[in-house]
Amino acid sequence: MGIEDGIVEHLPRLRRYARALLRDPVAADDLVQSCVERALGKQRLFKPGTNMRAWLFTIMHNVHINLARKQMQTANTMPLDQAAELPATPPSQEDALRVRDLAAALEQLPDEQRQVVLLVGLEGLSYKETADVLVAPVGTVMSRLARGREKLRALLEGNGAPHLRRVK
């Protein structure tokens, strides 16, 4: 399998992580495109037999950090007319409310915790792979994940009130 095939295989995971990280489909697609361009340009640096998924997520993380630094230096506006992608089948109302609550809770996490929760929980990376992507010790990844999960749990349990009230 060539590097191009490996990148294509991991595109859905890269897009999912970018969308969860940025919460803006257009910016997420731009991040994925930049990541793929960088990976293709640096393919000579990839060591065959190593973990391509971790390599790609590391590139994405670095591109994201660089873009965030640039955005801090220049004022950036967000378009108001961002259309959400609709799923193939609409979720039940209860599922939609759960997803909304989870997305809102994820937004309240500090960036470091949200990144770890998304990489481990959503993308299924191991602690070691996540540590490599974020350039952090495995112990730091584990503590950020534990704190992030605990905060998510507290936020979601705080939303334990019913979404609909009975009207008399």
Predicted region positions:
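A short, charge-rich alpha-helical start-of-domain segment used by transcription regulators
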Residues: 1-16, 26-29
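Conserved RNAP core-binding helix
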Residues: 25-42, 125
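A short pre-motif secondary-structure segment
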Residues: 116-120
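Sigma70-family region 2
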Residues: 34-51, 70-71
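DNA-recognition helix of helix-turn-helix
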Residues: 134-158
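Short hydrophobic short-linear motifs embedded
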Residues: 80, 161-168
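Arg/Lys-rich amphipathic alpha helix in sigma70-family domain 2
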Residues: 45-47, 58-78, 95
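Acidic, proline/glycine-rich intrinsically disordered inter-domain spacer in sigma factors
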Residues: 82-107
